[in-house]
Amino acid sequence: MIGPGMMRYYLLVLLVGLPLLALAKPVDCTDKPECWPEGSAMQMGLLLNQKQEKADKQMAAKHAALVSLAAASSSDSTPVDERLLKALKSQQAAWSLYRYEECELIGSLTGAGGRWPSTWAAQCVVNHTELRMRRIRSAIACIQKIPGDERYSDQNRCLQQLAPLTNR
């Protein structure tokens, strides 16, 4: 039989130990930034990946809006330029692949060890995405400034900025 002193001891251990267990980090905590030391390559890389996921969703929505805007420039006398719409979509998909490959090279060129090349590559992807978003927003704003009856013939000049490697 457990005496009153031992019962108090067990109760004290439970009262002190349970909150400490709740504060303990899970053993399998590798996919969250808070699981890694602040400033570490893993923490920074995971934070950048979270930022990138959010930015990719925003960019997909903005790009879809741009394609819709370009499609809306048609009229009864001028049909939708299907080739342009297909090119906008294809170029965006190709740009996305290019961005990752370019940034993988950038990360590798740092010469850093451990996880740092991946972290630098992730930062590069974020930078490229932010620049692309600025260009998409700028193209949308440019097209919106063109009077409706002139959009079909003038919108292409606004879209030129989406091909910066060719149009310098």
Question: Regions from the language model: what does each represent?
Answer:
Residues 2-10:
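Positively charged n-region of N-terminal signal peptides that target proteins for export
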Residues 23-168:
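N-terminal alpha-helical modules
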Residues 9-21:
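Sec-dependent N-terminal signal peptides
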